[in-house]
């Protein structure tokens, strides 16, 4: 049973999650590259088309390298509390995000892409939307905040109350992410199009580049998410070996 539990953790929480996020990662890059080529198709400027195609690839590639820097910046002590551990992980993610913002402005400046400053701002919008979604998820799922505490208290009156409260809380928890995504789409469209609704090509390119920005920190976030199953596997191995409670 312990082995099956460990295998299930690896399949669902590492392989499954990794494949899902990898698909989103590659999909955003390829879609943005196609939108970049289409955005400049009427100008017959093949050089600018090429720059628009490789820009999301360069941002994603640099994001991987900067995520590695963020991972190595995570430092903890042996007797660290849960709050200290979460703070250290948050520091690594935030550091990667800041470095990616700086790298994005540098990359698009070197490419001299049309409207490169506002396109860079669209990447920042994507990163901010990702942060908002992450914070919202933490707020609605962490035991440190009121929603889960209130849900736990509802269990005192019976399982039916927990089910009803849980479904309601789950529905409510989608509001902030949905609003953040809608605002991000509108903002990135306006920024990349130069606040011109008729410039649909550049607006759609801005939405795509914002999605690339949102996923540019995937390296460190995926590593953080995979830590849970790995730690659980270690606990399972210790249990099978009959090791003491201190392990």
Q: What are the language-model segments listed below?
A:
Residues 1-247:
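Hydrophobic packing and interface segments
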């Amino acid at each position: 049973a312990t082995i099956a539990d460990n295998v299930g953790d690896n399949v669902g929480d590492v392989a499954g999650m990794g494949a899902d996020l990898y698909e989103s990662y590659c999909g955003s890059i390829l879609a943005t590259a196609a939108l970049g080529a289409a955005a400049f198709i009427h100008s017959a400027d093949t050089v600018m088309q090429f720059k628009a195609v490789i820009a999301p690839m360069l941002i994603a590639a640099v994001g991987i390298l900067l995520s590695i820097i963020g991972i190595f910046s995570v430092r903890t002590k042996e007797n660290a509390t849960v709050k200290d551990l979460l703070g250290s992980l948050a520091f690594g993610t935030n550091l990667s995000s800041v470095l990616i913002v700086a790298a994005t402005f540098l990359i698009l400046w070197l490419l001299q892409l049309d409207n490169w400053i506002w396109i860079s701002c669209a990447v920042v919008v994507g990163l901010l939307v990702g942060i908002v979604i992450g914070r919202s998820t933490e707020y609605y799922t962490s035991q440190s905040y009121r929603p889960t505490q209130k849900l736990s208290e509802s269990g005192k009156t019976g399982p039916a109350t927990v089910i009803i409260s849980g479904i309601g809380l789950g529905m409510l928890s989608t509001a902030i992410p949905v609003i953040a995504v809608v605002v991000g789409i509108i903002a990135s469209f306006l920024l990349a199009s130069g606040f011109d609704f008729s410039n649909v090509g550049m607006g759609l390119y801005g939405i795509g580049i914002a999605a690339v920005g949102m996923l540019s920190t995937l390296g460190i976030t995926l590593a953080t998410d995979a830590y849970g199953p790995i730690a659980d596997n270690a606990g399972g191995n210790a249990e099978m070996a009959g090791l003491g409670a201190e392990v």
